[in-house]
Amino acid sequence: MPSTIISCAVTGSAPTPDKNPAVPVTPLEIANSAIDAARAGAAIVHCHVRSLETKKPSMELELYREVANLIRDADVDVILNLTTGPGARFSPSSADPGKASANSQMCSPEKRVEHILELKPDICSLDVATMNRKSHVFLNSPEHLNVMADYIRKANVKPEIEVFDTGHILNAKKMIDDGLIAEPPFFLFCLGVDYGAPATLETMLLMRSMFPKG
């Protein structure tokens, strides 16, 4: 029987303690959740960090550093996966659609991979996706993705290529062909997310058929 890889996202990008009080917030809580997951059998722990004031997703380097150090210092054999997703939330201003509203969180591609270059996790997420969400656009332009992928490759960190729909696989294949993502690629299907591909067997078979050969 083939081995099964269990990956545990201990917070995700959206849930907050308002929705579920069990969602970890502090670096110690996040690290302890990751360590518990590893001891329960997870091979990969996927980590976001949270602002200690707002409890919402944060990009603060020192929060990532504390989480990474706590996990690395623990007696667990687990692959550390840090997100690069934050910094791509765009919602147009109602007064001027060409500008971002207060609900947006946009930043440079360099900022989005700052913690990856500094901390060098085993792997990191790379969302090759632009798509509508409930209240905003998840905006990852080809230019920004190329810059991020190049930094990640030069840091010798393996990107976990997150695809939410079929076209995202084509985008990733172009980046592989251009030498921005090293082979063999590591893909992750993100299915059932508003408004991406549905979580069905048919979807998985179609997306699997589109993978690069080998």
Go through each PLM region and give its residues.
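Hydrophobic faces of well-ordered beta-strands that scaffold small-molecule active sites
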Residues: 6-10, 45-47, 78-84, 122-126, ...
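Alpha-helix-loop-beta-strand connector modules within alpha/beta enzyme cores
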Residues: 8, 55-84, 147-154, 206-214
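Active-site beta-loop-alpha junctions enriched in small/polar residues
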Residues: 9-13, 50-52, 83-89, 129-131, ...
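Catalytic alpha/beta core domains of metabolic enzymes, predominantly
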Residues: 123-214
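Conserved, mostly hydrophobic/aromatic
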Residues: 30, 37, 48, 124, ...
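Glycine-rich, proline-tolerant flexible connector loops at the mouths of alpha/beta enzymes
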Residues: 18, 43-67, 133, 190-191
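Active-site beta->alpha loop and helix N-cap motifs at the rims of alpha/beta catalytic domains
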Residues: 61-139
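N-terminal small/glycine-rich loop or linker at the start of catalytic domains
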Residues: 1-22, 86-94, 125-132
